[in-house]
């Protein structure tokens, strides 16, 4: 009976800690939402700037439902507040999982935890400053003397958020692949061998994550393939370092046990 109580106690403690971490995270999102709602109009104008630069200063967006402008500002505030709360969310996640990790596991994961939001920000920045102007020029090129573009707030925000998230996720590809390489789940040789299949998968992923037009699909597929190659490049460094570490450990074992090089190469001699 006492054993059951002792086993349940750590579980209850973990659940209480998880609840506290979640409450802090939700609180951070709410605070971020409230702060961003005060500037929701300015944030939306910032997001709409690439479109206005192409349409001209006199161009305006429309909303076709009475509540559309209000709920658009709510969505803008939520996504901006979520982005603002990211440091708190990552900190709470790390504080929850870190005590259950060994020192070498913490050392391996911590750099990836720091670089993850940075890479996502880089992907979103690429979308905003490079992809948006090119994509909007392409879309607006279908205007004519009888056809005029009248973008609505809701549809524009949906497109912008979708592209920012898509490019942000794309830039996270090295994090996932390098963690898999570090864990020994995949190898750079395997990634190179399957490169042609992954190129096809890149275009499939781009088709899923972007609007159904070939222009934005290609614009997203190119960074996916670039991130793939970057993962292979840095993955080789991880494998090289691991091989050197294993060789050093093997040499140290041989030195401690007075084993010559032939014995190191033939493990059956170690017995």
From Swiss-Prot:
It comes from the Bacteria. It is a multi-pass membrane protein. Residues 247-271 are annotated as: Disordered. It is found in: Cell inner membrane. GO terms for biological process: intracellular protein transmembrane transport; protein transport by the Tat complex. InterPro entries: Sec-indep_translocase_CS (IPR019820), TatC (IPR002033). PROSITE patterns: TATC. GO terms for molecular function: proton motive force dependent protein transmembrane transporter activity. The keyword Metal-binding does not apply. Keywords: Cell inner membrane, Cell membrane, Membrane, Protein transport, Translocation, Transmembrane, Transmembrane helix, Transport. The chain crosses the membrane at residues 24-44, 78-98, 112-132, 159-179, 215-235. One of its GO terms (cellular component) is TAT protein transport complex. The keyword Transmembrane applies. The Tat system comprises two distinct complexes: a TatABC complex, containing multiple copies of TatA, TatB and TatC subunits, and a separate TatA complex, containing only TatA subunits. Substrates initially bind to the TatABC complex, which probably triggers association of the separate TatA complex to form the active translocon. Part of the twin-arginine translocation (Tat) system that transports large folded proteins containing a characteristic twin-arginine motif in their signal peptide across membranes. Together with TatB, TatC is part of a receptor directly interacting with Tat signal peptides. Belongs to the TatC family. This is Sec-independent protein translocase protein TatC. It comes from Magnetococcus marinus (strain ATCC BAA-1437 / JCM 17883 / MC-1).
């Amino acid at each position: 009976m006492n054993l059951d109580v002792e086993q349940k106690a750590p579980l209850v403690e973990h659940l209480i800690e998880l609840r506290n971490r979640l409450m802090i995270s939700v609180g951070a999102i709410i605070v971020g939402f409230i702060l961003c709602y005060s500037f929701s109009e300015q944030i939306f104008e910032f997001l709409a700037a690439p479109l206005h630069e192409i349409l001209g200063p006199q161009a305006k967006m429309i909303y076709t439902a009475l509540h559309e402008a209000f709920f658009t500002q709510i969505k803008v505030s939520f996504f901006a507040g979520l982005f603002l709360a990211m440091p708190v969310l990552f900190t709470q996640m790390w504080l929850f999982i870190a005590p259950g990790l060994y020192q070498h596991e913490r050392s391996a994961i911590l750099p990836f935890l720091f670089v993850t939001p940075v890479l996502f920000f880089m992907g979103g920045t690429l979308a905003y400053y490079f992809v948006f102007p090119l994509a909007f020029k392409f879309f607006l090129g279908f205007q004519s003397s009888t056809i005029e573009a009248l973008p609505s707030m809701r549809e524009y925000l949906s497109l912008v958020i979708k592209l920012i998230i898509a490019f942000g996720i794309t830039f996270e590809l090295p994090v996932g692949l390098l963690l898999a390489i570090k864990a020994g789940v995949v190898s750079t040789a395997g990634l190179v061998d399957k490169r042609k299949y992954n190129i096809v998968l890149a275009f499939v992923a781009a088709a899923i994550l972007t609007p159904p037009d070939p222009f934005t699909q290609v614009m997203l597929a190119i960074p996916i393939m670039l991130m793939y190659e970057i993962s292979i490049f840095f993955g080789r460094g991880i494998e090289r370092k691991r091989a050197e570490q294993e060789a050093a450990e093997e040499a140290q074992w041989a030195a401690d046990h007075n084993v010559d090089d032939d014995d190191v190469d033939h493990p059956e001699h170690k017995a």
